[in-house]
Amino acid sequence: MKSTVGETLRKCRIAAGKSVREMSELLTSNGFKASEKTIYSWENGNSQPTPDALLVMCRAYGVED
């Protein structure tokens, strides 16, 4: 069974010990409009983050390219 981008984002966030609120604050401080609702929407597969926002999240989660 394939994981969706959203499922993978949620798994990485939890594995990194980050809350949705922490990620919202981090993204907002980096110039992105990312409310907690927005992050839940990404994780539920209802929308997708921009590539730049995804890069910030990957760095916060310790995911390397």
Residues covered by each model-derived region:
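Short alpha-helical DNA-recognition segment
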Residues: A16-S41
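Helix-turn-helix DNA-binding elements, focusing on the entry/boundary residues of the two helices
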Residues: L9, V20, E36, P51-L54
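Short, conserved catalytic or interaction motifs in soluble domains
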Residues: N44
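DNA major-groove recognition helix of helix-turn-helix/homeodomain DNA-binding modules
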Residues: T50-D65
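A short, Lys/Arg-rich alpha-helix, primarily the initiator
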Residues: M1-K18, L26
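Low-complexity, intrinsically disordered/propeptide-like segments
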Residues: C12, S29-N30, M57-A60
